[in-house]
Amino acid sequence: TYKPSKARIIQCENKATAKKALKALKDGTDPEEVASQYMVDSATYSGKETLITTKKTDISTRMINKLYKTKKAGVIDEIFTNESSGTTYAYVAVLVTNTYKDIKDEVYTTLSSDDDVKKACLVYYLKKYNFEVHDQDVFDNLKANNPEYLVSRPDLAKSKD
């Protein structure tokens, strides 16, 4: 599942900085103002509203689950860490909403522009309607470029990792 929620996340260099940012957020300071003061220079998350799903691999699963399960919008009283490219960053978050009806349009837009989702949907329908290729040129092209679409030949659809 994608566990969507909308949050303002601030990426900090370490836990000590994140602790200061969390205190400022709890004191009522605007997340973008807190971010400008405490975020790491190369931050992906800078206090702006962001749709968070399980597709986001640069933040911890624990944060995604916490945002998804929290009942009330506001500052999440916890510091999250995640190692990214050999560097450990600390994050603080403010939940904007995790109510599906409030973010469904954004979730729809995000998922419909995701190549993995598009591919999975196409494969689903190709299987459902027993897609077969009888033209050798088309078959060869699909075999070379998109073997997962050859659903009638699952032996070819496997990736060669």
Which residue ranges define each predicted feature?
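Gly/Pro- and small hydrophobic-enriched strand-loop and loop-to-helix capping segments
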Residues: 40-48
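Residue-level recognition of short, well-ordered coil/turn positions
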Residues: 29-30, 72
